[in-house]
């Protein structure tokens, strides 16, 4: 059962700071949180002995520990589409790319990420977190085709529990140094 005004705490990219800083706070306060790691980053850092909190990403072992606690769950943030360059912005279609090629690329990426979660002892994610918050109708169609039942974007708005679709859920970004009271006031 949810409180009258529930707050969902989410983290994108799967930074190691989720494990080092957020996980102890979740344990201390009994809070539940969501992290959406980029699966290729977790794959990479699981194979390295590099755990620098300033730049490293969550390993599969760390995610299993966090998931087992019941305080964290993990959602899909793509396998390797968290890029912002001249060729592509996140999961958006490139200029000149055919719809068939775009669909093939997305489905392969989403399925590879989903498989890695399961292969590494985690539940298959049910939510897709858009890299950079970038989305469009075609992308949403493919997200649904892959079986996701919710998406997290970056549009700042309050979500209401209505029983309606859980696609395009809004969130409020809290950059470093930003007073949490400002976000809570925005969400009123």
Language-model segments: residues:
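C-terminal domain-boundary segment and adjacent tail
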Residues: 1, 68, 118-120, 140, ...
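Metal-dependent polysaccharide deacetylase catalytic core of the NodB/CE4 family, i.e.
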Residues: 4-7, 27-136, 167-169
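Short acidic donor-binding/metal-coordinating loop in glycosyltransferase active sites
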Residues: 11-14, 130
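Solvent-exposed coil/turn segments that connect beta secondary-structure elements
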Residues: 14, 38-40, 79, 156, ...
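Active-site environment of divalent metal-dependent phosphoester hydrolases
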Residues: 16-18, 81-83, 132-138, 158-161
